[in-house]
Regions:
Chain B
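Alpha-helical residues within the helix-turn-helix
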Residues: 164, 423
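Short, charged juxtamembrane terminal tails flanking transmembrane helices
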Residues: 165, 513-519
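Short coil/turn motifs that cap or connect alpha-helices
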Residues: 78, 168-169, 417, 427-428
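Glycine-rich helix-loop "coupling/hinge" segments at transmembrane-helix boundaries
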Residues: 197-223, 460-487
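Membrane-water interface segments at the C-terminal ends of transmembrane alpha-helices
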Residues: 1-27, 39-153, 180-201, 228-247, ...
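Short alpha-helical segment that forms part of, or immediately flanks, the ligand-binding pocket
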Residues: 160-161, 419-420
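Amphipathic alpha-helical segments in well-structured domains
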Residues: 31, 44, 86, 159, ...
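Feature of multi-pass inner-membrane transport and sensor proteins
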Residues: 156-157, 171, 208-214, 220, ...
Length: 220, 519, 352
């Protein structure tokens, strides 16, 4: 059973095909990059996986379950058990680091003790233990990045979706975070779907790459 | 710099003069006016009435406005933009028109009383706190609605999506979306509160004893200009407190906003509840907007009533139109420069200009009007005082905040590098402003013109005090004709006011389309 | 604040005045847009507290007959007389108005006290009884409202006095407008003036004991009586005449006409010449016109049915000529003072 599978997926915006006839499978624990020039539909694919968009045609499966098909979403984002790191990180400015992480756990109905323990673990892994009471705006770019990753991982998702998360960082920080991400993957073994337009990140992060070109996908 | 001077002259000076004169009793500095007025129990009763009215109005407008804003901006409710437009209609005319409309329905001789003998009950209910809350609540609901929609549309969609990955819509709305737009909601609530504290026409029509009406009509402040100012002080204190809150709200927390661009906000599916929600919204629109407007239409749309209205107030309507148009033009120019100042923060104390504009906006028109008379009514300035320019100065002072805020919103959507690029390319200030900035904020300028036009058109308190003799506006004339005028005539005048507001806005709407199509 | 006070006030703000001059150029552009409209040679400016719906046609007639353009500022019903009163007071040092047309004499007398009006004794008011004029000519009364009783035709008792309100036989049958507002306040003040405070307070207490209902306005009182909910009410003559003309089952009774009784309270319009107004001569012409028999006749036959104060002017059938009416003998300046003085008593009585 694949972690993620797309079958003959089409998506059009205002008459223009953004994704056409795209199929791929991602196995559990894989590190896959989705790669392509801008406008090639990378983000659209990610948003369909996350459940924000339904494919016009075709089927999306997660954990073997059909979650969306032919213009209809069957399983909403909150029931897909995915974590996501957004390009702009999307940290909630009105909540502290701790509260940012707590949101998903509260939604799962976990008790305060369990929440505290899980958040403590994840924050330790991204080396941000001491910042749990801090608001995101007070953190550096690299720290914010790690909060976003921690928030995406805290609910122990089936897969982690990342949408060009490093595009706004300088090269040193990029290297550091790449290494850190690979460490985390080695420790936790989640499935990683990583969208990027950078060949370097593609090489570093993925053990497989899906190249989107002319709205079609080619597995590399 | 000139913008600062204009604002200071039209707005700040009259206030200083008023406060000064209120402290000057019989040739010496004295707090007698304050002791007398503020020591009077009735002052505080009225103040309490106003606070109660404003609080209830804010609660009603806030609750309905935020809920509707979320429904319109974030759910897949059908006809959402039409719904927003309908609920915003009351913004186009003075709140007392809604009051007149309700009166036609609920009054002792109203439509309802013809069918069911409850005219006395409904009339008592209308001419009291519930009626005033209903009228002002529906009049100011659009402010909350529009600000909620604006802030929701300006929100970064990924903030919501990040939450959607782990929770359903109710939890996301409660814990993420609404807290994120809290600054916008609070801003709108403070504005509604201040505007209902200062509202003159509707409470006057509904005979509610509130501060702005009574402080100028009751003996406490009567025959004594200084005492009138002293009586206005609690109101000014409330306004200042509200402004401090606004400043805190707006500057306390800096949120990242994503203006314009392709909105990729996911709409909340209402599912099976959709027909029920739609029905509820339509019913609410019918009650809050449809009923009072129908009341006005019903009484006022007879040929005889309309021709009577035109004959009695045709000239006033034209004047209203011209004054509002000229003021809106001037306001947009002024707003451009104030906004530029605030945007570039190039002059020290830029924020004080912004704060002053906001202060004047929320100051009751009656207070501002008296201050302006005190400042300008002087033999040497008679050439201004005795002309319609006086009224327009009042409009400019009162509504500068609107135009500057709207243009500022336009500026903040624009990258500062656009102007810097022109600067590097060697363009002088003049060419930068008129060659680069003006075209870029053209939509905002147009919006500012339309909004200030409507506000000037619907104003009552300033024309009553400042219109030069024989040159009143339609709103003022409607108010003065209400004394023993037939209700058909009053309704027809209100209808005229509604048309007056709708016609140019329709024209702007068309111009807007034409403008945008080539681009 | 007196005239001296105001001058000192202006002197106390040299900065303000200097800045005004310096800023002239800014406003010049505005003024240029609008066009300077001052200095019309043949015009008169009048501030009007009488209802616009009635007063405007009189002013139009004046313009048609004299060719003098009339610039009017009207008042709102709710802020009764306070809009233009505030303007008159605020403009004291640089008057814009030539004439103030008040709908009752008390406020016109305030203008005298504040030094805003100036004496002028119109020739055409010579025949109007002196008790309706200021002795020194600061204001002249004309066309009046009277405080009359309206009685439902089916009423069990026909009251003929304001004292009917405190007659135990009419318990729960009378209605009166809230005495905190309008002409009802004047009525109370007049009774307090004539009777003295003690008897006045007893009357107020009697109203409460006799379960007299308070309405929001005289019009509402008249409607209550017309619909039979109450049997009688003291209202303004225009409200009474209006209901009768619309065929409502009402009778108009002139109260307190008997020997030793107080008579009917008459509230005339009052017109005053403003001191230092820009067009004083035209102002005088307008005053002469307003207090003339012809204007009184027009106002008598208009919907407001006001009572002419000249003897011998034709009146509609619903109202009695002034010379056949026993009127309350009150000095309007005293009435104004009493009106202020009894405010606390009235507020307490109403339960504020």
């Amino acid at each position: 059973m694949s972690a993620i599978e797309l079958q003959k997926v089409w998506k059009t915006y205002g008459g223009r095909s953004v994704v056409s006839h795209l199929s791929f499978r991602i196995e559990k624990g894989e590190r896959v990059t989705i790669h392509g020039p801008s406008g090639s539909g990378k983000t659209t694919v990610l948003r369909m996986l996350a459940g924000f968009l339904a494919p016009d045609e075709g089927v999306v499966l997660i954990g073997g379950q059909e979650v969306a098909a032919n213009g209809k979403i069957h399983v909403g984002p909150e029931h897909r058990n995915l974590g996501m790191v957004f390009q702009d990180l999307a940290l909630w400015p009105h909540l502290t680091v701790y509260q940012n992480l707590e949101f998903a756990l509260k939604a799962q109905g976990l008790t305060a003790d369990v929440r505290r323990q899980r958040i403590g673990e994840v924050l330790a892994r991204v080396r941000l233990d001491e910042f749990s009471g801090t608001y995101p705006a007070r953190l550096s770019g690299g720290q914010q990045q790690r909060v976003a990753i921690a928030r995406a991982l805290v609910a122990q998702p089936l897969a982690l979706l990342m949408d060009e998360p490093l595009s706004n960082l300088d090269d040193d920080l990029k290297d550091e975070l790449c290494t850190h991400l690979l460490d985390l993957h080695a420790q936790l073994g989640f499935t990683l779907v990583y969208v990027t337009h950078s060949k370097e990140e593609m090489r570093k992060i993925g053990n497989r790459a899906i190249l989107l070109k002319d709205a079609k996908g080619v597995s590399v | 710099m000139a913008a600062v001077v204009v604002l200071a002259i039209v707005g700040l000076l009259p206030l200083c003069l008023m406060v000064g004169s209120s402290l000057w009793v019989d040739g010496s500095l004295s707090s007698r006016n304050y002791v007398e007025v503020l020591g009077n129990a009735r002052t505080w009763i009225l103040f309490r009435n106003s606070l109660v009215l404003a609080t209830l109005t804010t609660a009603v407008a806030g609750l309905a406005g935020v809920s509707l804003g979320i429904l319109v901006a974030r759910t897949d409710l059908p006809f959402s933009s039409s719904i927003a437009v309908v609920f915003s209609l009351p913004l186009l005319f003075p709140p007392y028109i809604l009051a007149v409309g309700w009166f036609e329905i609920l009054g002792r001789g109203g439509i309802l009383a013809r069918w069911i003998p409850i005219g006395e009950t409904t009339s008592r209910w209308l001419f009291g706190l519930p009626g005033a809350v209903l009228v002002l609540g529906s009049a100011f609901l659009p402010i909350v609605l529009l600000l909620t929609i604006t802030y929701l549309r300006g929100m970064n969609p990924s903030l919501e999506q990040a939450a959607r990955l782990s929770a359903g819509w109710p939890a996301v709305l409660r814990r993420i979306t609404i807290p994120l737009i809290t600054p916008g909601i609070l801003l709108s609530l403070v504005l509604v509160f201040l505007l209902s504290m200062g509202e003159f026409g509707a409470p006057a029509f509904l005979r509610i004893d509130v501060f702005p009406v009574a402080s100028f009509t009751q003996s406490s402040a009567f025959y004594n200009f200084g005492a009138a100012t002293a009586a206005a002080m609690p109101l000014i204190a409330v306004v200042l407190a509200g402004l401090l809150m606004i400043q805190r709200i707006l500057h306390g927390r800096a949120y990242s906003f994503r203006w314009g661009g392709q909105s990729t906000l996911e709409r909340i599916p209402l599912g099976r509840k959709k027909p029920i929600v739609l029905l509820a919204v339509v019913v609410l629109a019918a009650i809050l907007v449809g009923v009072p407007l129908a009341g006005v239409l019903w009484r006022g749309s007879s040929v005889a009533a309309l021709s009577d209205a035109l004959q009695r107030a045709g000239e006033s309507a034209i004047r209203s139109f011209v004054y509002a148009g000229l003021s809106a033009t001037f306001l947009s120019v002024l707003g451009f420069f104030v906004a530029y100042l605030v945007y570039r923060r190039s002059v020290a104390g830029w924020w004080s200009v912004d704060a002053l504009a906001l202060f004047l906006f929320t100051l009751p028109g009656t207070v501002l009007g008296i201050g302006l008379i005190a400042l300008w009514n002087h033999p040497s300035t008679n050439w201004i005082y005795a002309t319609p320019a006086m009224l327009m100065i009042g409009f400019v002072a009162q509504y500068a905040a609107l135009s500057s805020r709207i243009v500022l919103a336009g500026f903040s959507q624009m990258s500062p590098s656009l102007e810097e690029a022109a600067e590097v390319a060697g363009a002088g200030w003049f060419r930068r402003v008129f060659g680069i900035l003006t075209p870029l904020v053209r939509p905002a300028l147009l919006a500012s013109w339309a909004v200030t036009f409507v506000f000037c058109l619907r104003d009552v308190a300033l024309p009553l005090l400042l219109a030069s003799p024989g040159r009143d506006t339609l709103t003022a004339r409607t108010m003065t004709l209400m004394a023993n005028g037939s209700s058909e005539l009053i309704a027809a005048l209100c209808l005229l006011a509604v048309l007056l507001a709708l016609l140019p806005l329709g024209a702007i709407g068309i111009a807007w389309r034409l403008w945008r199509t080539p681009a | 604040m007196g005239q001296e006070g105001s001058q000192q006030l202006a002197a106390g703000f040299p900065v303000a005045r200097r800045t005004v001059n310096r800023s002239c150029w800014i406003v010049l552009s505005l003024a240029a847009l609008v066009g300077c409209g001052t200095g019309r040679p043949n015009a008169v400016t009048v501030y009007v507290s009488e209802d616009q719906i009635f007063s405007e046609s009189i002013l139009k007639d004046f313009k048609r007959e004299t060719g003098i353009k009339v610039n009017a500022v009207f008042d709102t019903e709710e802020a009764k007389s306070t809009g233009v009163m505030n303007r008159l007071l605020a403009e004291k040092n640089n008057p814009q108005a030539d004439v103030y047309w008040a709908n009752e004499p008390v406020r016109a007398d305030v203008l005298r006290q504040q030094g805003i009006s100036t004496p002028y004794k119109p020739v055409s008011a010579a025949e109007i009884p002196d008790r309706f004029k200021d002795q020194q000519g600061y204001w002249t009364g004309f066309s009046a409202r009277a405080r009359l009783l309206v009685v439902n035709k089916a009423a069990s008792i026909k009251p003929a006095s304001a004292l009917a309100y405190v007659d135990p036989k009419t318990k729960g049958k009378g209605v009166i407008a809230n005495p905190l507002f309008g002409t009802t306040t004047a009525q109370m003040a007049a009774l307090f003036t004539l009777w003295g405070d003690e008897k006045g307070k007893q009357f107020l207490a009697g109203l409460k004991n006799n379960k007299v209902k308070l309405s929001t306005s005289n019009g509402e009182s008249a409607d209550f009586v017309a619909s039979g909910e109450f049997e009688f009410a003291l209202v303004d003559s225009d409200d009474a005449v209006d209901r009768v003309r619309h065929g409502k089952p009402l009778e108009i009774v002139y109260p307190d006409q008997g020997e030793g009784e107080v008579g009917v309270l008459i509230l005339p319009n009052a017109v005053a010449l403003i001191r230092g107004g820009p067009n004083a001569e035209n102002g005088k012409k307008l005053i002469e016109y307003l207090v003339s028999k012809e204007t009184e006749r027009k106002l008598a036959f208009a919907d407001c049915a006001q009572i002419p104060l000249h003897p011998g002017v034709a009146t509609p059938k619903e109202i009695k000529p002034i010379e056949q009416t026993k009127t309350m003998n009150v000095n309007y300046a005293d009435l104004g003072a009493k009106l202020q003085a009894i405010q606390p008593i009235l507020k307490e009585w109403v339960g504020y």
